[in-house]
A protein has these predicted regions:
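Acidic, Mg2+-coordinating active-site environments of NTP-dependent enzymes
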Residues: 1-137, 216-219
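ATP-dependent carboxylate-amine ligase
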Residues: 29, 86, 98-108, 112-270
Length: 270
């Protein structure tokens, strides 16, 4: 375990809200910096009360705190979080801040670094990259598991949209229940689901992944439209060509570089 190998003078940065991660603190020879969105989480509250370091969110700011020391960074100055609207990106940023703080990086440098974090594809391709297309919001992400779907849905629900659509395939090397669960989650948040299958099935037979995705959509409380398509780019075109002003489309890309280039070309073409 990585945490067990932290030296006595080192620091482990741990997510206080994940029980499997938080318990690693007892194995750390060095000190621990916890992070969480809520400073009142029991582990965070205890850790802070004992004078240890932690990073949390308060009134639209990231707060790095230890004892009487507090340093505030406005989330409005961290583009990748969309002003704090994207929770999973806020958590990523908190972990980054905690790590830089542990390395004694000065705060001006940390803030400058955070200001350079953005959602564009040049910064981190396939990681919640956002585009504007015909007045609609298009988001491209490489999420391929239930946890990713839950995080993406939470982020999407924080964004305004008159209608939501999603383009998805499934990684054939995942368990059946994991593939099904992805569309179960998406079916609660999207009006339309475009399912696609492409050449790389990772050991699955043709049609097998689509069938599992279809099963996951059964009884979906929100999804009223769905379709099945062979070919990633054809699926992307179908979803993007239907978009109207004020709508939102989440595209769960498979061939990251190629798909990102395809989306960018469509956006440029208008």
């Amino acid at each position: 375990m990585i945490v067990q190998n932290v030296s006595a003078s080192g620091v482990a940065v741990l997510n206080a809200t994940d029980p499997n991660v938080a318990t690693m603190a007892s194995k750390c020879k060095g000190s621990v910096t916890f992070f969480a969105l809520d400073r009142h989480h029991p582990i965070m509250a205890t850790h802070l009360a004992q004078g240890h370091a932690a990073v949390y969110v308060e009134d639209g700011h990231l707060v790095a705190a230890q004892g009487k020391f507090k340093y505030y960074i406005s989330l409005s100055q961290v583009p990748i979080t969309l002003g704090g609207a994207i929770s999973f990106q806020v958590e990523n940023v908190m972990a980054s801040v905690a790590a830089a703080w542990a390395l004694k990086v000065d705060w001006a440098t940390i803030e400058a670094g955070l200001a350079s974090f953005s959602n564009d594809s040049d910064n981190a391709a396939g990681r919640f990259n956002m585009f504007k297309h015909r007045g609609a919001t298009v988001i491209a992400d490489y999420g391929h598991n239930p946890d990713a779907m839950s995080a993406l849905v939470q982020a999407v629900e924080a964004l305004p949209a008159t209608r939501r659509s999603v383009v998805i395939s499934g990684a054939g090397d995942r368990r059946d229940q994991d593939i099904r669960q992805q569309t179960e989650i998406l079916g609660r948040a999207f009006d339309e689901v475009v399912m696609f299958e492409d050449q790389c099935q990772r050991g699955r037979k043709d049609g097998e992944v689509i069938a599992l995705l279809r099963e996951g959509l059964k009884g979906a409380p929100r999804t009223k439209e769905s379709c099945e398509i062979y070919g990633e780019f054809i699926a992307i075109d179908k979803a993007m060509d239907k978009l109207k002003d004020g709508e939102l489309c989440l595209i769960l890309v498979d061939q990251v570089e190629e798909a990102m280039a395809h989306i960018a070309a469509k956006v440029a073409a208008g």
